[in-house]
Amino acid sequence: MQLLTIGINHHTAPVALRERVAFPLEQIKPALSTFKSVFLGHPAPNAPEAAILSTCNRTELYCATDDRAARDAAIRWMSDYHRIPADELAPHVYALPQSEAVRHAFRVASGLDSMVLGETQILGQMKNAVRTASEAGSLGTYLNQLFQRTFAVAKEVRGTTEIGAQSVSMAAAAVRLAQRIFEQVAQQRVLFIGAGEMIELCATHFAAQGPRELVVANRTAERGAKLAERFGGRAMPLSDLPARMHEFDIIVSCTASTLPIIGLGAVERAVKARRHRPIFMVDLAVPRDIEPEVGKLKDVFLYTVDDLGAIVREGNASRQAAVAQAEAIIETRVQNFMQWLDARSIVPVIRHMHTQADALRRAELERARKMLARGDDPAAVLDALSQALTNKLIHGPTSALNRANGADRDSLIDLMRGFYQHAPRSSDTSDH
């Protein structure tokens, strides 16, 4: 069984491409079904195991398969699924086989591959991806084991290193950028669009600045109101956004919409109504919530997740000692997992040996029963049974020894010594 990870992330692709390859939550189960039934075309039980991790910064397909051509086929599947030309997508895709796939999973869950070094959000996102794959019936022995060990490694790394200490989060970076535009965030009106985990983190950081007003707009009014209440703000219907956008100095958006919810025309009208007072906008969604053309407007300062990356990286450099410690832990755990994987490769052989031996046993047992039924001496029947089983069980090894020559024979003899502890050494088999 081969492990394989196919993906793109913030290291290999810009947000303009990442948003085209992202999987909305409701599409993941159907996509996994397509992958299993169409991509490799294998009927159960040989269908590949698969899980999809899709976040703002990465889209990754983890799979376990017997197909040796899985790498190219997986990239082709991703290209076809998202209707992106293969020659456009391929340069940005990484394909990680076996131990590289294991190492990558461990690093991702531990926060070592994140834009925000050591951030914890990715671990929850990976657990959700595994839960979704499990519900879709696309997990099996290999990926289950990979992810269970992945979560254990992440816990070990975070518990024994300082990888997450004093990390500069995306939310904190957004506040820093806002302070470059507005000297006092406390004097500004802030609007959050969405009510998910990222918006909650951003609201926490902006609320700490004591803004003049804090408003949450969300498709689900109840959830938006609950979040706003936590921070002493108020909620507004998302449908009011076009008419009221001009009221806000700072707008932070992160929804699960597959299409932009803030267009160029709406922002142009807001800027005009504000008499060209600046608007600071942060788009943390992938796919993006705000049309990219908005960033070209004179009085609009629009930042995406990639733009916030530079500020985040400034805080990452000081924690390289923790990174080295985490990498050492991960490398040890990768080796442990690969030992388990190697051991799994002999399971089919052992199973076949048991099946074959049991078939021999059943055949000889039936033969012995027939002998007893016709009145043969029980002692003679037992002796014949034991002789027949002995001859058939050692037939394979003795035939292999007889066919072997030279060094191969010596190796086989030494191997047989391990099987049959009292067998003579190969050096003792020559005539004296």
Swiss-Prot record:
Binding residues annotated for substrate, in chain numbering: T55, C56, N57, R58, S114, E119, T120, Q121, Q125
CDD domains cross-referenced by the UniProt entry: NAD_bind_Glutamyl_tRNA_reduct (cd05213)
One Gene Ontology MF term: NADP binding
Disulphide bonds in the chain: none
Reactions catalysed, as given in the entry: (S)-4-amino-5-oxopentanoate + tRNA(Glu) + NADP(+) = L-glutamyl-tRNA(Glu) + NADPH + H(+)
Pathway assigned to this chain's UniProt record: Porphyrin-containing compound metabolism; protoporphyrin-IX biosynthesis; 5-aminolevulinate from L-glutamyl-tRNA(Glu): step 1/2
Site (Important for activity) location in chain: H104
EC number of the protein: 1.2.1.70
Keyword hit for Lyase: no
Keyword terms: NADP, Oxidoreductase, Porphyrin biosynthesis
UniProt binding sites for NADP(+): G194, A195, G196, E197, M198, I199
Biological process according to GO: protoporphyrinogen IX biosynthetic process from glutamate
Matches recorded under Pfam families: GlutR_dimer (PF00745), GlutR_N (PF05201), Shikimate_DH (PF01488)
Major enzyme class: oxidoreductase
Active-site residue numbers: C56
Domain of life: Bacteria
InterPro entries xrefs: 4pyrrol_synth_GluRdtase, 4pyrrol_synth_GluRdtase_dimer, 4pyrrol_synth_GluRdtase_N, GluRdtase_CS, GluRdtase_dimer_dom_sf, GluRdtase_N_sf, NAD(P)-bd_dom_sf, Shikm_DH/Glu-tRNA_Rdtase
Miscellaneous section: During catalysis, the active site Cys acts as a nucleophile attacking the alpha-carbonyl group of tRNA-bound glutamate with the formation of a thioester intermediate between enzyme and glutamate, and the concomitant release of tRNA(Glu). The thioester intermediate is finally reduced by direct hydride transfer from NADPH, to form the product GSA.
Domain notes: Possesses an unusual extended V-shaped dimeric structure with each monomer consisting of three distinct domains arranged along a curved 'spinal' alpha-helix. The N-terminal catalytic domain specifically recognizes the glutamate moiety of the substrate. The second domain is the NADPH-binding domain, and the third C-terminal domain is responsible for dimerization.
Assembly behavior: Homodimer.
Family: Belongs to the glutamyl-tRNA reductase family.
Function as written in the Swiss-Prot or TrEMBL entry: Catalyzes the NADPH-dependent reduction of glutamyl-tRNA(Glu) to glutamate 1-semialdehyde (GSA).
Protein name as catalogued: Glutamyl-tRNA reductase
Originating organism: Burkholderia thailandensis (strain ATCC 700388 / DSM 13276 / CCUG 48851 / CIP 106301 / E264)
Organism classification: Bacteria, Pseudomonadati, Pseudomonadota, Betaproteobacteria, Burkholderiales
Name of the encoding gene: hemA
